[in-house]
């Protein structure tokens, strides 16, 4: 893969081959698709405990009945334009309390750009106190699915968390991602999920600018950029979606299935604060799903993740509440991704009697929806 990238870069620099803009874009898309295919077959974890399984399209299941509650932080979602060609404000809103920021942007121009998230106290004479309670970020690979997966690994891994806090005086600003922004080379992605708390209203701005731009001045003067053809930005209430199965799972004769991040389930609805227009989070990116269930009986139950929308690469957490255990799970662990074939699925665990929670979130650059399946073991 690295050889292919080096050859491609060499062609651009030497000029021995004339490449039209449309051909170049098509090549990039083909290269990305090739990298996804390769990634779904590359080993990345030794001694994996998961087991690949195959779920045919005509697989017969029973719909799991679950109670649903949405609560938790307000979500700021910035993913359109996904590939950024012009400097400007990509998303902006004023928020307070518990907030989750999900951003996903690619530098689409030749040369480096700076991606930044600015926090500004615009209204409060008293200082605004803020805290970063959890975060995960990744980027800089041509394989965007790997970036999405690594970002989630960091977000869900308790040991990688480094809580931060600070304050903003009246009119004061601070850059959130690194203190100076993130320098993005051409065609590179940066994706992040950040949980925050503000004790007073704060203006949050996601922006792209020149590498040497003064961030505070740019944040004041820059124009808000329009979305691309995919309407994926906005502000959404209650970004934690909780499901609790109504009945214990007891070696079911017919497998139980719960489908998530699907149009039938419905997506989070909110407002694009830059325009005031209604917004819908197609895919529920940035939403944290928690599925609570009880396993009963003497026989273990097979717990399966089945991505049915295409290649999928993420992380999640399996909690055994009976034993007080929390396990970080690569989804999948043997390869970067799975789901390049519709029958591909993974058995995450064989679960004995007890109370469990499975926590996950739709990863950036992955395909949806997914199914959770509980079936009896052989």
Predicted region positions:
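Short, solvent-exposed loop/turn segments enriched in Ser/Thr/Gly
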Residues: 108-116, 188-192, 285-291, 354
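Bacterial N-terminal signal peptides
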Residues: 33-42
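Intrinsically disordered, low-complexity Pro/Gly/Ser/Thr-rich segments with frequent PxxP/GP/PP motifs
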Residues: 148-185, 328-353
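Asparagine-centered strand-capping/turn motif at beta-strand->loop junctions
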Residues: 105-111, 118-127, 196-198, 295-297, ...
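Terminal connector regions
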Residues: 183-219, 368-376
């Amino acid at each position: 893969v690295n050889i292919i990238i080096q050859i491609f870069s060499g062609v651009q620099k030497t000029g021995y081959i004339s490449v039209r803009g449309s051909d170049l874009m098509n090549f990039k898309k083909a290269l990305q698709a090739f990298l996804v295919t390769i990634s779904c077959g590359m080993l990345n974890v030794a001694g994996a405990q998961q087991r690949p399984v195959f779920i045919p399209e005509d697989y017969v299941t029973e719909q799991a009945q679950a109670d649903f509650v949405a609560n938790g932080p307000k979500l700021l979602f910035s993913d359109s334009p996904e590939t950024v060609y012009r400097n400007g404000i990509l998303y902006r809103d004023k928020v307070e309390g518990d907030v989750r920021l999900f951003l996903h942007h690619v530098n689409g121009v030749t040369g480096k750009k700076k991606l930044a998230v600015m926090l500004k106290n615009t209204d409060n004479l008293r200082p605004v106190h803020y805290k970063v309670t959890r975060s995960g970020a990744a980027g800089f690979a041509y394989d965007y699915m790997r970036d999405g997966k690594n970002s989630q690994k960091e977000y869900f891994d308790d040991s990688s968390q480094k809580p931060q806090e600070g304050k903003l005086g009246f009119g004061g600003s601070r850059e959130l991602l690194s203190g100076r922004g993130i320098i993005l080379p051409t065609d590179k992605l940066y994706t992040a999920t950040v949980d925050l708390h503000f004790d007073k209203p704060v203006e949050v701005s996601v922006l792209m600018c020149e590498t040497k731009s003064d961030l505070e001045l740019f944040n004041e003067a820059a124009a808000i950029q329009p979305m691309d053809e995919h309407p994926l930005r906005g502000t959404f209430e209650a970004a934690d979606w909780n499901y609790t199965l109504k009945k214990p799972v007891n070696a079911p004769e017919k497998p139980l299935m719960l489908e998530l991040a699907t149009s039938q389930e419905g997506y989070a609805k909110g407002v694009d604060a830059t325009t005031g227009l209604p917004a819908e989070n197609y895919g529920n990116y940035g939403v944290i799903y928690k599925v609570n269930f009880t396993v009963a009986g003497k026989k273990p139950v097979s717990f399966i993740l089945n991505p049915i929308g295409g290649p999928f690469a993420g992380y999640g957490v399996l909690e055994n509440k009976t034993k007080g255990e929390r396990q970080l799970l690569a989804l999948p662990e043997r390869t970067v991704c799975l789901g390049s074939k519709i029958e591909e699925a993974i058995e995450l665990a064989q679960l004995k009697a007890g109370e469990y929670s499975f926590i996950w979130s739709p990863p950036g650059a992955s395909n949806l929806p997914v199914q959770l399946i509980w079936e009896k073991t052989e």
